[in-house]
């Protein structure tokens, strides 16, 4: 008989099958103990054929008992191997789960710090917007005063007909202020858009924190079940839990990287806004200086006196006023050149932001291909 080969190829027995095998073995032991009693109970006046058959039966029972003993040895060795393999598997799973939990806690702390930084930068942006609105109102008031003064000068002085360059510069200044207002409106829209993005990221951060809390609850439930004496989870459940944890860690890493990108974008926008505010301050001071230094308000009595003066004296007066007017135009030209520099800086920042966005897409594509 080839019983040992069958014992090697068959599947490992379950608990119910082991209990049945033990019952079968006990029954076989009892059956094996019967033949000598039956042989002793038989009368001595039997034939030799009958004794030969009994000897064959006894040999068969002995061989069966040996095979059963071998099977019992194999079963006990298999049980020992199973217990030895279960213990290191449990230890490795617990170690990996603890490492993943520590990583999740560290990433949660990093996300909290980034959210705090974003909120602080948004508060600074709101304050700067309020300052910009105040500066805009001051600029509008100064524009009104400049327009009134220019109207008085046009009505009172006749020498401005010989100065077409001054009129062209004034028209340039008038056309320049609406352009600044449009840029301010566009910057305000950008800040509102960034605020909406920050709110979206805060919502995603709350969802991630909820997922982490649910995972912690599940871990606590598993611990309670283990303490109550329930069966440990199988290998498939451990693998699924491990995959879920790895996916959560990947999501947290992607979220932290996107938060870093948003932080850099906000810093660039804040720098641009600071430069805008500085330029508006310079414009405001440049507007106040000619208003304070030059006698912009001319009375009707002075105009009457100028009309009475001869043309030679009028030309001398206009020649005296020419350097002051040229100084104001020079200051305005400097302001417009500073605006061009600011535009160039903004274009450089936009190129930098596009490079950052492209790198983020390149990083996300291999991650999606791997998943």
Swiss-Prot record:
Annotated segments matching region Helix-loop-helix motif: 110-120
Q: Where is this region: Disordered?
A: 223-246
Question: Listed GO cellular component terms?
Answer: cytoplasm; nucleus
Q: Which residues form the signal peptide?
A: none
Q: Where is this region: Basic motif?
A: 121-188
* Primary localization class, coarse: cytoplasm
Where is the sequence biased in composition, kind Polar residues?
223-240
Where in or outside the cell it occurs: the entry states: Cytoplasm; Nucleus
The GO molecular function terms of this record are: DNA binding; DNA-binding transcription factor activity
What UniProt keywords apply to this chain's record, in alphabetical order? Coiled coil, Cytoplasm, DNA-binding, Nucleus, Phosphoprotein, Transcription, Transcription regulation
PTM text: Phosphorylated by MAPK1/ERK2 and MAPK3/ERK1.
Residues annotated as carrying Phosphoserine in the record are 98, 202
Report which residue ranges the record marks as coiled coil.
96-148, 177-289
InterPro entries of this UniProt entry? Spz1 (IPR042961)
Annotated region Leucine-zipper: the residues are: 245-266
The miscellaneous comment for this protein is: The helix-loop-helix and basic motifs form a SPZ1 specific bHLH different from the classical one.
The free-text function statement in the UniProt record for this protein reads: Transcription factor that binds to the DNA sequence 5'-CANNTG-3'(E box) and the G-box motif. May play an important role in the regulation of cell proliferation and differentiation during spermatogenesis.
What name does this protein carry?
A: Spermatogenic leucine zipper protein 1
Gene encoding the protein: SPZ1
